């Protein structure tokens, strides 16, 4: 989005125009998935939406969890954070497994792409899980939408727009609320609304400090 200072593509570029067209098609496929609620409808929607909307961004060479950074997959790993490999190495040491009571046969993985692929081929990733939140909010369960401006994968603008359109008991209050800077021992850059969302300024995935 051009309203995000970290946008990857120029608004008038061919890439953006293609993304707009793909977004419209993705929305239609998602509607069919939501209506039919079947693998036959949801898997094609999932594959098309992820491929057409995330594909161009993946080709830029930036870290999609923090677009201010470049990503060298050979050096930084599949998900652009070498720390994840370090954690895997530590947790797969026999001594650590023994202390934690983990069987030798189990290998720890920071992110299991095989499981990810299985979710994708069930069409789960494209289904509207927001339906599950509405009754929780009505029952008084608190929800915090927490996003970093520089995170492409969990896009702050998209999350905010979703929160403002999401039908729930706080819908009117959230839309009428104003964004106010949040201070916690100094300015944080976050601008929460009283009823709902927090966008963490200048941060990446999970608003990871120093990302």
Tell me the role of every PLM-derived stretch.
Residues 1-211:
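Terminal and linker regions of secretory-pathway proteins
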